Amino acid sequence: MGGQEYAISHWPDTEEILAKLDRLVKLPMRPIKRQQMANYLEHFETACNQSKQLNEEARKYIPGGVQHNLAFNYPFPIAVSKAQGPYLWDVDGNRYIDFLQAGGPTLLGNNYPAVQEKVSELVRECAPVTGLFHEYELKLAKLINSHMPSVELFRMLGSGTESVMAAIRAARTFTDKARIVKVGGAYHGWSDQMVYGLHIPGTGAMEAFGIPSGCLKGTDEVFPNDIDSPKGLRALLEKNQKKGGTAAVIVEPLGPESGTRPVTRDYNRRVREACDEFDALLIFDEVVTGFRVGLGGAQGYFSVKPDLTVFGKCVAGGYPAAGGLGGRRDIMACLSAGLETGKPRAYVGGTLSATPLSCAAGYYSILEIEKTKAYIKAGRAGDRVSNGLQGIIKRYGLPYVAFNHGSICHLETSGAMLLDIMAPNALAEAGPRKQMMEEMGAAFTAEGIITLAGSRLYTSMADTDEVIDAALQGFDRVFRNIENA
């Protein structure tokens, strides 16, 4: 780990967690009691009426009534009016503990004053965007390199999706190979080539509506933690080698969906070894883990050096246009900007890439993360949340599963995203389990806790013991009203 500190205080027993998750999906569901769920839904009607009215009007002008997947709340989206520290407030004046954290970027807490002041100052003096070079592009690139030596060159982009697109294009340009291998269930944005094996391993192109099949011809999928089986990573790389080879393997280093399906402690090392054996590049998608796991990222924690690293979220500290790609100098040279000709160049662009605003926000956010050791504080908060949830689950004899990797916490109650797609009853169970997951998320919200889909929680430096204790009391009120087995 190179002497750096990291948010993950201990690596959880992956085999034990996977066994518990497997047991969860095999057992009958344990949803909230119907009368209590009706009470929660009534709460939304009375306490969140302005949010409901806004959403009803928004549906006339916005597809589905919201612009962001994270906002698809049941029974309707909550309209936020204010964010500060560990809290969110809605338009009805209700306060919530924010464990969504905008999907992970606000490690310092919402609207962190020191960063806000620097960004506001820059916008007043310069502009949010100019289309020309600004010194913060250099400052941010140097700062990232100082913490992640594998990032010899860094290119700021507009989002995690764009950054994955750039990584794939650079890998193919550099290697002159076509095939990309991803892990089933992992999320790497919504570009044509990555809408494959989403959420649940083995689903392939099931969600690839509107994407021509030819776009996915170069994308392969392997199951998480499977290196050496006849259908594992090594076998796939060997098969591809006979047909021109593999350009790159892309992984979320904690496991698919930010560790929802956790990988073993040595998984990334073994993937690195397989890539080296079959001459494929290794891409770490650190959109979530970058700076949240520690200043050295997941690559520093695991002591595994990727060839390319994808950034997002924390790289702009919760401000817009958060994306980036970094890595080996020779590979990144394929992304050189400008009008240079005479050598293969992977084309990328973006009007709002590397704006003064996003680069300054990223630079000062990372400085504050370094100064405050926000990743350690958020990691301790994550430990406290996870341990507390485990205690509540045990107290009420529930089959639910809670675990964490530092400040990235998982709470599986329905197992909706853990189904085996090949199981005979998978499709029949998917709908009811998804409904239960949505109901759990609604119950948590009614108790003043915002989560990601009722199953993932991001903690921040702002989450004090007092905040976490209040949240655990809310979870306790939900879990004491669960249907009997």
Q: Predicted regions span which residues?
A:
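Conserved N-terminal phosphate-binding loop of PLP-dependent enzymes in the Aspartate aminotransferase
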Residues: 2-485
